[in-house]
């Protein structure tokens, strides 16, 4: 009996010990859960505060950001031959060949090239002057032998303005061609109107040309795709375009302004639609403007001229498209020159 009693006492002690150990484990488990919950809450609070701090540039984000830059060296930008301004416009290219700007005569074409991506360096084919310094890219009161991409516009791919310059020389219409590009990919007409962020850049470009002794002979406008996508009305487009024309006139540009029929840019990858509707508000506005006087003339109808094979991504102009568009501009400018000469 005594042995049995001792055995029961030992079992009871063991059970008690296990129960105590379990209680301690439960307590530890509860403590751990509390720690996790508190930690998660703290992390969420820090995330929220950090987001507000970063968004509004208030304490402690600027201080932490500065500390990170001191402790961890920022990755240096990869070397490039290109230089861009704060609006991503190409303003430098180490491959350019600087030359003396041609003296302007009555056989010099000075083309101010305005618009969005299909007037900028987004073409599918690069071109260069076939006539050396007779076709130049004017930028910042300097001239360079014309070659894609042109200084003064966004992006670094191809363009067809240099090809147009070659055609103007080859046709005998001009002895020299000065290309003055100012085109911004994706730009709406509102950005070019008075109060828009591109209007002062336009004014500065005109002043640079004038300071170089150059008088613009034609303004070529290729834009409209962005406004179709965002739903700009025909009335609003006309008002904003005329505001830009007023800026040109107020700063001494008396040359004709050619407004292209340009509204087609397909596929969501380009910010466009799946299908194009030719009769749209932007085209109606462009047609009305070209017939409304004020020195505004109808430019190339790229919507109708170019087919699917001429746009390498259903929006931007490829090699065959560049040939078509440059020849169409040649015909327009040559025809108007003959008309003016006959008067």
Whereabouts are the PLM-identified features?
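Short, Lys/Arg-enriched N-terminal segments with co-localized hydrophobic residues
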Residues: 4-8, 16-31
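Cell-envelope and extracellular/periplasmic
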Residues: 39, 46-343
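N-terminal compositionally biased, intrinsically disordered segments and leader/signal-like regions
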Residues: 8-12, 36
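N-terminal Sec-pathway targeting helices
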Residues: 27-45
């Amino acid at each position: 009996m005594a042995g049995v009693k001792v055995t029961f006492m030992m079992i009871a002690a063991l059970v008690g010990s296990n129960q105590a150990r379990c209680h301690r484990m439960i307590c530890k488990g509860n403590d751990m859960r509390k720690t996790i919950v508190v930690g998660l809450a703290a992390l969420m609070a820090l995330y929220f505060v950090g987001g507000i701090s970063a968004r509004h540039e208030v304490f402690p984000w600027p201080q932490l950001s500065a500390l990170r830059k001191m402790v961890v060296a920022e990755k240096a930008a990869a070397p490039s031959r290109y230089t861009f301004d704060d609006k991503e416009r190409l303003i430098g290219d180490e491959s350019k060949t600087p030359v003396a700007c041609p003296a302007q005569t009555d056989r010099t074409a000075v083309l101010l090239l305005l618009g969005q991506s299909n007037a900028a360096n987004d073409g599918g084919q690069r071109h260069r002057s076939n006539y050396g310094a007779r076709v130049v890219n004017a930028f910042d009161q300097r001239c360079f032998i014309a070659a894609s991409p042109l200084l003064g516009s966004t992006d670094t791919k191809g363009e067809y303005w240099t090809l147009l310059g070659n055609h103007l020389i080859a046709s005998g219409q001009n002895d020299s061609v000065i290309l003055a590009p100012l085109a911004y990919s994706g730009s709406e007409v509102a950005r070019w109107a008075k109060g828009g962020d591109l209007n002062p850049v336009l004014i500065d470009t005109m002043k640079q040309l004038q300071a170089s002794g150059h008088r613009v002979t034609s303004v070529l406008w290729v834009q409209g795709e962005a406004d179709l996508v965002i739903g700009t009305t025909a009335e609003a487009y006309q008002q904003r375009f005329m505001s830009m024309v007023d800026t040109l006139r107020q700063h001494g540009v008396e040359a004709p302004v050619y407004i292209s029929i340009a509204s087609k840019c397909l596929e969501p990858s380009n910010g466009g639609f799946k299908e194009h509707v030719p009769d749209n508000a932007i085209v109606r506005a462009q047609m009305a403007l070209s017939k409304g006087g004020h020195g505004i003339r109808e430019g190339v109808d790229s919507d109708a001229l170019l087919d699917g094979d001429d746009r390498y991504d259903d929006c931007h102009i490829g090699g065959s498209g560049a040939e078509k568009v440059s020849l169409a501009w040649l015909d327009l400018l040559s025809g108007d020159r003959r008309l003016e000469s006959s008067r």
